[in-house]
Amino acid sequence: MMRTWANINGKLEFIGLCSARGEEWVDGGDGYMYSGNDVAELSCMSYHELRSIAEAEEVDFFPDDSLYGLAVRIAEQRAAKYGRQFFKQEKRSAV
């Protein structure tokens, strides 16, 4: 079980403990896993494509962002602007 946040009315809000089974989750490189329609779609693109999208949609990003980190930044902004599906979970550590 992991703590999970979801986009609710443009805000990322804690929704409880959930299992990630059967869903595609992307490691954002910040200790969290992310999921949602845009996350899945964007994480399949090249870094160059993501940089172009980030610039066009005026998403703040850093030159050293990973491909998945950049995909997450774009998806998170889309969720806030357009109410798109977006989930965030604490990353589980291996025992």
Regions inferred by a protein language model and the residue ranges of each:
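Basic helix-extension-helix modules of the SAP/HeH family
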Residues: L17-V95
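A short beta-strand micro-motif
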Residues: R3-I8
